[in-house]
Amino acid sequence: MALPQLSEGAISAMLGGDSSCKPTLQVINIRPINTGNGPPRYRLLMSDGLNTLSSFMLATQLNSLVDNNLLATNCICQVSRFIVNNLKDGRRVIIVMELDVLKSADLVMGKIGNPQPYNDGQPQPAAPAPASAPAPAPSKLQNNSAPPPSMNRGTSKLFGGGSLLNTPGGSQSKVVPIASLNPYQSKWTVRARVTNKGQIRTWSNSRGEGKLFSIEMVDESGEIRATAFNEQADKFFSIIEVNKVYYFSKGTLKIANKQYTSVKNDYEMTFNSETSVIPCDDSADVPMVQFEFVSIGELESKNKDTVLDIIGVCKNVEEVTKVTIKSNNREVSKRSIHLMDSSGKVVSTTLWGEDADKFDGSRQPVVAIKGARLSDFGGRSLSVLSSSTVMINPDIPEAFKLRAWFDSEGQVVEGTSISESRGGGTGGGNTNWKSLLEVKNENLGHGEKADYFTSVATIVYLRKENCLYQACPSQDCNKKVIDQQNGLFRCEKCNKEFPNFKYRLILSANIADFGENQWITCFQESAESILGQNATYLGELKEKNEQAYDEVFQNANFRSYTFRARVKLETYNDESRIKATAVDVKPVDHKEYSRRLIMNIRKMATQGV
C-alpha cells in the first residue's frame, strides 16, 4: 500500500504564518524535555519531505499518543491544528495542538527522501508542488513592512500571525494561546472569554487577613483558572463579567492545584500589580464553556473527590432547605436535584446558595455542571462547588441530544439511582417508586442493608393505643421519662429530674394501595403529618377531651399520602419479620403522581403488557 505523500514546503508555510494548512509530515525523532514538577513535554523533529525542523512541540493533551506508542519515530501524521510561538531570543516554536497518525511507524521503512534542515531566514529550494501541497509560503516581511491585514481577523490569525496589543503602559505584548502559557514567559497577552466568576471571599488566620476571587477563561486552544487577591480583587472584580471577552496581560503562572477544579490546564494564573484586563469587542469567534462530560453510569467507577463535568435531565427536584456552615456559622440554602442521562442511571446532586434558591425544575430542564465534586456519601452523589459552573438548558450539542432522548423515550424510564436516599424527598430518581405488592414480591428489606422505597398509599387503620408518651424535655433527648409521683420526671439517659416533659408520638399505621397492605411505624414528624396536629396539642386533648382526641384519629383514616419508607428484616425472640418505618410522609402531588402513572402506562404499552 502506498504511503501518504508528504506536504513539501509545508514547514516554510507554517512558519510564514499560514495557519490554514493541514500538512502531512513524518516524525524523524521524539525527545522528552524535563519540566520539573510539570507534566512531561515532547519535542519533535519532523520532515515535510523537503526540510526538517526540530522546533515542533507536542501539546500536553497529546502526550498519550507518545505514551501509547502511537506517535513514534518514522510514523506519518497530519497536523490539523498548530500554533506558532515566538520566543524571546527570536526563535520560533510550532506547538502541535491536533494531530492524526495516518501511517504507523512499523509500516514505514525509514526516513522518506533526503530532507535538509530548515534554515530560518534563508530561501528554501523550490519543490514541485503536488496537488495536495499547501500554498507557497509568503515572502518574509522586511522590517519596514506593514503586517498583512489578515493578522487582526479572528483568534486563529491572532495566534499564528503574531499580532501585538498595546498595553496601558505603552508597551506591546504578543497575543498568544492559553495552551502555550508557561511560568518561563514574561510578556504575554491572551484573548479569552470568562466562563465562570466566583464571589469575593475573605480569610483570616495567624498570618493576616485578605480577600480573593477566581475566574475561569477559555480560548480556542484551552482554558485556565485565574485568581485575584486583595488590591487586584478590588480592582478587577467589578470590571470582569461572565461571558465577556477580554485581553489579559502579565499574570504570574504556577503549577495548578487540581483538587478543587476541573479546569484542564497544568498551570493557573494569579493577577499581580502589572496585570491588565482590557475588554475585547470582537468576540464572536471565542468559544464558550468547554466541557468534558462523564456519563452518570460511569460515576461509580470514579474515585471519591474527583472533580468532573456532568450533564443530565432534572428528573426531580427537592425543596430548598437552610443549613448552617459550622466553619463560619453562616446559613446557606441547599437543594438536591436528581439528574438522569441516557445510561438510565440517576445521581443526586446538591446545589448551594443562589443556585439552590433560583433553580426551577418544574419543566425537567437539562442541567450541565462544570466542576462538580463526586462524593461516596450515600452511594454516589455530586455537589456543586464555589468554582463550579451550572448551566440550565445550555446551547450545546450534548444538551440537544439528551433532550431529544428524554422526550422520545427517557421520560418513561424509571431510572436506577446510584445515590442512597437520606430522607427528605418524596420524588425523583432516587425514590425507588414501588407498589406495596412489589415491595412484598421483590423481598425488599431481606438483604444485609435496609431498602428504601416510595409509594402512594391510603391510611386504613391507626393504632392510637400507646401512641403518645412523655419524653425528656431536653432538646437533644427523646427518651421516655419516669413519673416520680412528686411533680418531677426522671430521664435515665440524662440522669436528671425535670419538672416538666414533652409529648412524643410513635404511631402504628396500616396503609394499603390497590394490591397490598403494610403496617408501618411513623415517628414524630410523620405522625403529626398524618394526624394533622402536633404532639403537644394531642397530649393536652387526651387529658381534657377523650372524644375529641378519638375524632382526630377517625378523621385521619382513608386519606392518601406519599410515603417514603425504610424496610428491614428484624429478628426478635427468634421471630423474624419485616419492619417498615416512615422516613417521610407528604400529601400526594396529584399532578406528579398522574404524570408517573401515564409514564408507566406508556412503558407497559411499549412492552406489550
Swiss-Prot record:
DNA-binding segment(s): 188-272
Family annotation (SUPFAM superfamilies): Nucleic acid-binding proteins
Segments of skewed composition (Pro residues): 125-137
GO MF annotations, alphabetized: damaged DNA binding; single-stranded DNA binding; single-stranded telomeric DNA binding; zinc ion binding
GO biological-process terms attached to the record: DNA replication; double-strand break repair via homologous recombination; meiotic cell cycle; nucleotide-excision repair; protein localization to chromosome; telomere maintenance via telomerase
Disulfide cysteine pairs (residue numbers): none
Record's keyword terms, sorted: DNA damage, DNA recombination, DNA repair, DNA replication, DNA-binding, Metal-binding, Nucleus, Zinc, Zinc-finger
Zinc finger feature spans (C4-type): 472-494
Intracellular or extracellular location(s): Nucleus; Nucleus, PML body
Matches recorded under PANTHER family: OS03G0429900 PROTEIN
Family per record: Belongs to the replication factor A protein 1 family.
Quaternary organization: Component of the heterotrimeric canonical replication protein A complex (RPA). Interacts with rpain-a.
The name this protein goes by in its record: Replication protein A 70 kDa DNA-binding subunit
